[in-house]
Swiss-Prot record:
This is Large ribosomal subunit protein uL5c. Binds 5S rRNA, forms part of the central protuberance of the 50S subunit. It is found in: Plastid, Chloroplast. InterPro entries: Ribosomal_uL5 (IPR002132), Ribosomal_uL5_bac-type (IPR020930), Ribosomal_uL5_C (IPR031309), Ribosomal_uL5_dom_sf (IPR022803), Ribosomal_uL5_N (IPR031310). Part of the 50S ribosomal subunit; contacts the 5S rRNA. It holds the Pfam family Ribosomal_L5_C. The gene is rpl5. It comes from Cyanidium caldarium. GO terms for molecular function: rRNA binding; structural constituent of ribosome. The keyword Transmembrane helix does not apply. GO terms for cellular component: chloroplast; ribonucleoprotein complex; ribosome.
Amino acid sequence: MSGGNLQHLYFNKIRVELQKQFEYTNVHQIPKLTKITLNRGLGTLYQQSPKVFESSVSDLMLITGQKPRFNKSKKSIAGFKLREGTVVGLSVTLRRKKMYAFLEKLIHFSLPAARDFRGLSTKNFDGLGNYNLGIKEHAIFPEIDFDKIDHSYGLNICIVTTANNDIEGKALLKFLGMPFKD
């Protein structure tokens, strides 16, 4: 999937609709997607089982199409048995075509495949038009073979926009096809 359909839809139809709805005088005021970040905290899995760590890296690579960045601890904390420099999470930042391809896959395939999915909450906006979404199982993505999963884990997905407030951000994501409850 190229993501061209959603990107084409945004540039040809959604921008015009948003400009009419919010009465923007300048095309640069129209909200757009900036990036999508995926984060996965590893906790103590990295220390306990290297196999789970390697599968987490490969699964995130399959889901996004690019290699994840390793987030390392900044200081040692004895209570958590954590040393400075230990990998504590993985993150991927998607932009441009990969961002639109991932969003299209998320909206049309992954979210409807989630168990008991009834729509996304509109309370997950941060006040600046950015949307945060937590996924409990990474197996909802079509690239992941459910039979080969050793350990199921969740992801945090942050959709960053140039919107000034939640109303503009919600309108943008709704036009893009995000399945909100309301």
